[in-house]
Amino acid sequence: MFFKKITLIPFVMLINLYRYCISPFIPARCRYYPTCSEYALEALKTHGILKGLYLTTRRLLRCHPLSKRDYYDLVPCKNKKG
């Protein structure tokens, strides 16, 4: 568990760098709730690096003006076998 949190730090830092240093200077344009950066943080924390990056990439590719997807796009729950 500790190793998982340590490996997430660089990704969380990059997302926060975008959120607090870059995002304030560009107009808000995310089509979804939660925003893409919030989604990325949640996906990484819930699913880990590999699946979290996969889900984040899919989300970013869907976030464009021509998208006909629903407004709410939540991170999928983590399936637990057993």
Curated annotation (Swiss-Prot):
InterPro entries: Membr_insert_effic_factor_YidD. It is a peripheral membrane protein. The keyword Lipid metabolism does not apply. Pfam families: YidD. SMART domains: Haemolytic (SM01234). Keywords: Cell inner membrane, Cell membrane, Membrane. It is found in: Cell inner membrane. One of its GO terms (cellular component) is plasma membrane. Belongs to the UPF0161 family. Could be involved in insertion of integral membrane proteins into the membrane. This is Putative membrane protein insertion efficiency factor. It comes from Francisella tularensis subsp. holarctica (strain LVS).
